[in-house]
Regions:
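Core beta-strand-centered patch of the WYL/Sm-like small regulatory domain
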Residues: 1-138
Length: 138
């Protein structure tokens, strides 16, 4: 199975459980994307994937926002949970019953709560800390 930094996987799982938007940096890009995370799962090549509905930020494809987008979890460099809460995008095509979610599911959002699973390794916050500019002041 693909390996992702445990703290990033833990943050993504929490955002899905709480149905909160996230800001992320992807593949070393400087720009930030804001997405509504809906599911984390292993694909056919055992890569951890995040299915998310991108609502703001950079799009290397040039597609107009908003749109569905899969992200390879291991290519997510930074992630921060935002205050914005979202409802699952059923009208835009999201379904927890999709075949790709049947095997290797880590976390998935459902209304009004979330069906939530977390691998044992992700429960440990052993990865590198988030960069200072992405931490919230207490």
């Amino acid at each position: 199975m693909d390996v992702a930094p445990p703290n990033i996987l833990q943050i993504l799982s929490r955002a899905i459980k709480e149905r909160r938007c996230i800001a992320l940096r992807y593949q070393g890009q400087r720009s930030v994307r804001v997405v509504e995370p809906h599911a984390i799962y292993s694909d056919a090549e055992s890569q951890l994937m995040l299915d998310a509905y991108q609502i703001r930020g950079h799009s290397s494809s040039g597609r107009p926002l908003p749109f569905w987008r899969p992200f390879r979890v291991k290519k997510i460099d930074e992630v921060e949970i935002l205050k914005n809460v979202f409802m699952p995008r059923s009208a835009e095509g999201f379904s927890a019953d999709r075949l790709k979610y049947k095997h290797g599911l880590v976390a998935i959002v459902e209304a009004p709560g979330a069906v939530f699973a977390q691998p044992e390794a992700a429960a440990l916050d052993v990865g590198p800390p988030r960069p200072a500019h992405m931490r919230r002041a207490v």
